[in-house]
Regions:
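FabD-like malonyl-/acyl-CoA
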Residues: 1-142, 187, 191, 267-296, ...
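Alpha/beta catalytic cores of group-transfer enzymes, especially the acyltransferase/condensing modules
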Residues: 10-12, 103-249
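A short, acidic, amphipathic alpha-helical segment used as a generic capping/interface helix at domain edges
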Residues: 249-266
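Structured loop/turn residues at beta-strand edges in well-structured enzyme cores
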Residues: 1, 83, 183, 221, ...
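Glycine-rich phosphate/pyrophosphate-binding beta-alpha loops
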Residues: 60-62, 196, 251
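NAD(P)-dependent dehydrogenase/reductase Rossmann-like domain
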Residues: 212, 217, 259, 263, ...
Length: 309
């Protein structure tokens, strides 16, 4: 049986994520402690209690990475010889998680990199009142045309199933709501985001992030990664630096990535908080997706692997 690993991005976070892992597994407790030491913040409080910190990209991103890393390690322990996916695919931030878990970036460095990525995004969007908005029920072509006619709004994520995420100035996004309803939008939902990702607002941080990747990454990949920006497979440092930097200002083409690689695998494992990618995959793939964001999902994945691998 062939399988792929999926890693969620910003927007999948919620209070309590990773808690069942922390309560049941010594490894998870140790990783929470290491993460707290690396970031100099109590990650248990940040993830398990109501607080403002989890709304800041500088902490949201390492928090999401932490839960993905734990899910991967717990599942990896249960597989004879370790996980050997055909490929890994992350949604936005999740691509950084995928690169790390392929072996190119160790745990502490990845925590600091995701923290810096989120912080740079916040700085790039400072004083812009930026946000992101999900539009359901309007075609990609119609939204691309609308964005071309609209100042400070861009298509940021093509998630498939007539779901597109727009990024830009909050007031400009809000002003589009009546037009979107006229165009047939079933739902328009603002995301809990303090930044506008995958758009020109992030151009000021591209070079700095590229430098950070050059310093942090190793040229060591155990499995290939699918690029969000170009839908190409890569497994070396040079390409990772190029494509993770490019991704900042280019839309996430999740739909294309799943559809063009669907026939290569029999099942997808979503590693990390929530089941956002499982939901998207229902519209994109005829293959099952198992979400490993808590102990129940972990048990389901282990049972599946024991039966078929």
């Amino acid at each position: 049986m062939q399988y792929a690993l999926l890693f969620p991005g910003q927007g999948s976070q919620c209070i309590g994520m990773g808690k069942s892992f922390h309560e049941s597994h010594t490894l998870a407790k140790e990783l929470f402690e290491r993460a707290s030491n690396a970031l100099k913040v109590d990650m248990k409080k940040t993830l398990f209690e109501e607080n403002e910190l989890l709304k800041e990209s500088a902490y949201t991103q390492p928090a999401i990475y932490l839960v993905s890393y734990i899910a991967y390690q717990l599942l990896n322990k249960q597989v004879n010889g370790g996980l050997k996916p055909v490929f890994a695919l992350g949604h936005s931030l999740g691509e950084v998680s995928a690169v790390s878990l392929s072996g190119a970036l160790n745990f502490e460095k990845a925590l600091k990199l995701t923290h810096q990525r989120g912080k740079m995004m916040q700085e790039a969007c400072l004083n812009k009142d930026a946000s992101m908005m999900v539009v359901l029920g309007v075609s990609e072509e119609s939204l691309l045309s609308l964005c071309q006619r609209t100042k400070n709004v861009w298509c940021a994520n093509f998630n498939g199933g007539m779901q597109v995420v727009l990024a830009g100035i909050k007031d400009d996004l809000k002003a589009l709501e009546p037009t979107l309803k006229e165009m047939g939008a079933k739902r328009v939902v603002f995301l809990e985001m303090s930044v506008a990702s995958h758009c020109p607002f992030l151009e000021p941080m591209v070079f700095k992030f590229q430098e950070l990747l050059e310093k942090s990454l190793k040229d060591k990949f155990h499995f290939e990664i699918i690029s969000n920006a170009t839908n190409e497979a890569y497994h070396n440092k040079a390409k990772a630096v190029e494509l993770l930097s490019l991704q900042l200002t280019q839309p996430v083409r999740y739909q294309d990535c799943v559809k063009s690689n669907n026939d290569r695998v029999d099942v997808f494992f979503e590693l990390g908080c929530g089941s956002v990618l499982k939901g998207l995959n229902k519209r994109l793939s005829n293959k099952p997706t198992i979400s490993v964001g808590d102990n129940k999902g972990l048990d389901e994945a282990i049972e599946f692997l024991e039966e078929y691998v």
